[in-house]
Amino acid sequence: MKIGIVSKFGAPDGLCIRADSVLKGLVKRGHEVHAFTHSKTVNGLPKEQIHRFKAVWLNPHYSLDSLSSPKSITGICRKLDIDVLHIQMNSGTTEMFLPFYAHLLPPTTVTFHLAYAAGRSFYTSIFAIAWRGSLYSARKYDEIILVDPSQKHYIMEYGLPEDRLSVIRNGVDTELFSPPTRKMDDGIIDFVYVGRLSFDKGVNILLDAFGEYHQENPDSRLTLIGDGMLKSQIEDAVEDDSISWIGTIEHERIPEILQRMDAFVIPQNIGGLGLSVMEAMSCGLPVITTAIGETVRLLANDEGILVKPHSAPDVVDAMRILGDDKNLRHSMGKRCRKKVEDQYSWKNQIQQIEQVYERAIANKKR
């Protein structure tokens, strides 16, 4: 197939990691892929298959795109005879206006990356507004891919039919994200967090919880990977030698850090079983995360520990449980690795995406 992908690429966030992985997987499967993007970096494609448009970044994750980009994308799709156009929703304004060209576009598939916000807060209200804008523009897309089943109910409430919805969770490169052949035991319990430094990811809760746990167990460390609005709070925290902040790094470098750790912690209050969680599981780490959305169903009791949202005491208790029991950490980690290998490798996810493309093409011909 000739496949067009409208997305940002190359940034260290879940959307870009998924977009990069889908592009790589489709090329590996023999498809001709064209990227429509405002990103400077697109790996794995020749220059003639990268079609750029101008954009102004409103924040690290969303852009105000050139008003001419939807028309330009439509024209290139027609010229190249693209079979299916895949839009990664929630990266820029182009996705909002492409549906106005639906009658001229090839069959379309859109992936929703926003998770439904649980609870009441300023941040969940922002996510709800973004949801409504995305849902409004999605009505004219032919097929819709959700990254979390908990999104399905809310999307159907807006009148989108179930037969156009497919749930294809994030995948993991299980060869890159693999357990260490041998882990050094220095007597320190190492916890790690990977993601945005933001309130919705529960970083403030994590810092409070680790501070309390470290007072009880000085032989413990916390490593944080990522950047975001809580950067200044992190900078203050790293004055303590027990906390290390690495910042933003290349995605390919994350496994070597995870392989040195004992447990992964992300007390988020929005979303489900995110990509960073599954990558940690693939490296054989037990997980401490929040009992929200599909996480309750997807993470078994013998794979990690679920805590209540906004609860630092719960996180402290979970750290105690894992910190005190090396055998438990090991057994949980082995089960996490097996689950990712069996259910969440990118090879399986790409095949599911291809099936959605085929359905979009078949339905458009009717």
Predicted features along the sequence, with ranges:
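Aromatic "clamp/platform" in nucleotide-sugar-dependent glycosyltransferases that forms part
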Residues: 269
